[in-house]
């Protein structure tokens, strides 16, 4: 069983496989995911080994059916693997139950989605406070941290605006501020520019690059090569396997 009583990063990292760098944030070994679709068994991921270190900016790419969405769901603790192991910041999450996964998800991961996922009747400030409500933070802590997070993404003068009073780029900035407010180990962005025009997309990617320069670990899931080019490392999935990793230029046949 996975240890759930270990609280310090050093203790958790000591339990990682010996060949894993001590600054690894994400480690997968032989990660597999299968689905039953009618009478057909679909192998969405087929033995993925991946290590992502602290303060990396990584793009996971691939065409439709490559397994990138499945990989995102597993990395984000939204799903569990059929086989294999997954460690997130030292937590062996591949063996955790639903309640423990939910706690890890809220603590360790900041999500940014293509469709923003903002509450339409709530202000930008209230939207950013939401993850801290789930974390049990006090009202003052929520307000102070949400204000700081919105200021960090350039929306210090838009805190009281509702989503329909903001542009698409501003709404995505609110979503990024919300993702950052709990100081997550990783920022996980799923097609974050998919609903934005090219100029606004460049602005959002520039923001990601600034956050990365400030020390944030970022994982970007995209099918767009020009967006992936902003990352410092690109991992290409094909047919559920790693076909290319720009950090090693290894091509799997």
Which residue ranges define each predicted feature?
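ABC family nucleotide-binding domain
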Residues: 22-238, 242
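ABC-family P-loop ATPase nucleotide-binding domain
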Residues: 1-34, 244-253
């Amino acid at each position: 069983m996975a240890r759930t009583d270990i609280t310090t990063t050093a203790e958790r990292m000591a339990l990682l496989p010996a060949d894993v760098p001590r600054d690894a944030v994400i480690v997968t070994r032989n990660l597999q995911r299968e689905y039953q679709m009618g009478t057909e068994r679909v192998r969405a991921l087929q033995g993925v080994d991946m290590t992502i270190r602290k303060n990396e900016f990584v793009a996971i790419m691939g065409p439709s059916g490559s397994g990138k969405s499945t990989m995102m769901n597993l990395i984000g603790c939204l799903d569990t693997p059929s086989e294999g192991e997954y460690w997130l910041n030292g937590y062996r999450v591949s063996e955790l139950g639903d309640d423990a996964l939910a706690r890890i998800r809220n603590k360790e991961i900041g999500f940014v989605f293509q469709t923003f996922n903002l509450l339409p009747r709530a202000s930008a400030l209230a939207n950013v406070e939401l993850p801290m409500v789930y974390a049990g933070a006090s009202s003052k802590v929520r307000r102070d941290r949400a204000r700081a997070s919105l200021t960090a993404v350039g929306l210090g003068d838009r805190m009281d605006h509702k989503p329909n009073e903001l542009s698409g780029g501003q709404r995505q900035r609110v979503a990024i501020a919300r993702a950052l407010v709990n100081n997550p180990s990783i920022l996980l962005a799923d097609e974050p520019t998919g609903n934005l025009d090219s100029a606004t997309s460049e602005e959002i990617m520039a923001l990601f690059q600034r956050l990365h320069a400030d020390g944030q670990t970022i994982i970007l899931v995209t099918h767009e090569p020009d967006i992936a080019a902003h990352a410092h490392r690109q991992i290409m999935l094909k047919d559920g396997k790693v076909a290319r990793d720009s950090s090693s230029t290894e091509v799997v046949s």
